């Protein structure tokens, strides 16, 4: 599973890609935030830097190409 750690200013949040659906442009991600694990489906977007999904109230871009195989 591909994993990415994001620092939100207070703590690290871990994202693990569960699946990517190119047909519906969605990515399913297991999010570990402060000890709680949630599986969330995000819309995939694309810009000049690649495919990403938006996370949090500030809609931070989390790029799929930043994930590393765990």
Across the structure, where does each feature detected by a protein language model lie?
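A short beta-strand micro-motif
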Residues: 2-8
